[in-house]
């Protein structure tokens, strides 16, 4: 956590911090992973997903899309991440985006500003993905490593499975049928799982497994099954791999990963920037963001997909995806 956050905590009594820590563990972090997700807030507070996302965006200092304990302190103390900054620092952020210095940020300036920061952090994102996926330590990602790790890190699917609560529901269902707890389903377990609502023949189950089994081990891991629910086939993922593997040598280099991330995320960034302009320019509805709008709306509620690209430059945080 940043020095700013440390200073904020330093002004609080130790017993208050301990009490908040217990509250965080007992009532908020329901899956005990050390963070509070949008899905957990929705369930706990009976909020809409949009409300939960907005709350997390206002507190998400390290821009990972979750609420860490230190960020939870901000929430419980009625503060927000922008209060960790001085007015001069926020003004500097605004001026960095306002390229022509006319006191307002145009859609084009926002596009260019976000992309400038984006190009600076994409190398770090690529290196992090390579490190996470590279099981054999050769500095590259082969097809099997891509299947095992990256298909759940990159936004390849377009279906409802990007909803965290949806994923959690199916993960719990999946685990009920994973009798030995090894994280995968055998043919028999898969048959039992899939036949809850509809009866399938052995041949149909075998065909389904062949479509879902990304690493060809004859079993179905949860990530494989979940990608199938998201409308992503094995052939589609292979096409994604080959599109990133520019030299067609069967493995992805760090340089190729930079290219792949840029291509995959470009459309997402376009969508998020357009959404930011629409949601931020609410006072005079002129299609631009003035300084008041920047402070009161844009900076506070910036979605974490853009947050993770822009604000870490000022926070000194690593980008997580």
From Swiss-Prot:
**GO MF term set:** calcium ion binding
* Keyword rRNA-binding applies: no
Which keywords are on file for this protein? Calcium, Metal-binding, Repeat
Q: Which residues form a coiled coil?
A: none
Among InterPro entries, the record links this protein to: EF-hand-dom_pair, EF_Hand_1_Ca_BS, EF_hand_dom
Q: Does the keyword Transmembrane apply?
A: no
UniProt-listed PROSITE patterns: EF_HAND_1, EF_HAND_2
Provide the residue positions that the database annotates as binding Ca(2+) 6: 213, 215, 217, 219, 224
Q: Which Pfam families match?
A: EF-hand_5 (PF13202), EF-hand_7 (PF13499)
PANTHER family documented for this protein: CALCIUM-BINDING PROTEIN (PTHR10827:SF85), RETICULOCALBIN (PTHR10827)
Name under which the protein is recorded: Calcium-binding protein LPS1-alpha
Q: Which organism is it from?
A: Lytechinus pictus (Painted sea urchin)
């Amino acid at each position: 956590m940043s020095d700013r956050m440390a200073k904020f905590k330093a002004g609080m009594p130790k017993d208050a911090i301990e009490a908040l820590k217990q509250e965080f563990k007992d009532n908020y972090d329901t899956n005990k992973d050390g963070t509070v997700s949008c899905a957990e807030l929705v369930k706990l507070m009976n909020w809409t997903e949009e409300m939960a996302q907005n709350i997390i965006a206002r507190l998400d200092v390290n821009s990972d899309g979750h609420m860490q304990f230190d960020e939870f302190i901000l929430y419980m103390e009625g503060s927000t991440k922008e209060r960790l900054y001085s007015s001069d620092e926020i003004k500097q952020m605004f001026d960095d985006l306002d390229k022509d210095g006319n006191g307002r940020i145009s859609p084009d300036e926002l596009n260019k500003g976000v992309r400038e920061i984006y190009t600076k952090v994409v190398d770090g994102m690529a290196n992090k993905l390579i490190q996470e996926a590279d099981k054999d330590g050769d500095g590259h990602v082969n097809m099997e490593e891509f299947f095992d790790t990256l298909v759940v890190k990159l936004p390849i699917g377009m279906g409802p499975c990007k909803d965290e609560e949806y994923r959690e529901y199916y993960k719990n269902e999946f685990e009920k049928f994973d009798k030995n707890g090894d994280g995968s389903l055998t043919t028999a377990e898969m048959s039992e799982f899939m036949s809850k609502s509809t009866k399938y023949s052995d041949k149909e189950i075998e065909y389904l497994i062949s479509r879902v089994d990304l690493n060809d081990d004859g079993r179905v891991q949860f990530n494989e099954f979940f990608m199938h629910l998201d409308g992503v086939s094995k052939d589609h993922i292979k096409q994604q791999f080959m599109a990133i593997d520019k030299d067609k040598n069967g493995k992805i280099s760090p340089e190729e990963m930079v290219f792949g991330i840029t291509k995959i995320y470009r459309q997402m960034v376009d969508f998020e920037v357009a959404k930011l302009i629409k949601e931020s320019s609410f006072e005079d509805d002129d299609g631009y963001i003035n300084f008041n709008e920047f402070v009161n709306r844009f900076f506070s509620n910036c979605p974490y997909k853009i947050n993770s690209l822009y604000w870490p430059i000022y926070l000194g945080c690593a980008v997580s995806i």
